[in-house]
Amino acid sequence: MNTVRVTFLLVFVLAVSLGRADKDENRMEMQEKTEQGKSYLDFAENLLLQKLEELEAKLLEEDSEESRNSRQKRCIGEGVPCDENDPRCCSGLVCLKPTLHGIWYKSYYCYKK
């Protein structure tokens, strides 16, 4: 009976000591994995940041192209009221006081030259 107790005690001590070693190893593995995970996250974050910077550069480039090609001021079409001091009539039109049918209106209109 003593041999059974000694054997059981020996197996118990080995299990506890190996179990703690496994626990320490598991803790070390978890730390390594979290460190690797952090490095992967840093890598992914840097990659995402680069992509966002490229997108931003493209968008800013498109904005600058649009501003170069866009009209500075919109022009006023034919028969539309205009300001006598600041005419914005389209090319080929002149800001004039209306004749005949529009004489009761006190504003100027864009007419063909």
Curated annotation (Swiss-Prot):
The keyword Disulfide bond applies. Expressed by the venom gland. Residues 1-21 form the signal peptide. Keywords: Disulfide bond, Ion channel impairing toxin, Knottin, Secreted, Signal, Toxin. It is found in: Secreted. It comes from the Eukaryota. One of its GO terms (molecular function) is toxin activity. Residues 22-74 form a propeptide. Probable ion channel inhibitor. Belongs to the neurotoxin 14 (magi-1) family. 01 (HNTX-16) subfamily. The presence of a 'disulfide through disulfide knot' structurally defines this protein as a knottin. This is U11-theraphotoxin-Hhn1a. It comes from Cyriopagopus hainanus. The lineage of its organism: Eukaryota, Metazoa, Ecdysozoa, Arthropoda, Chelicerata.
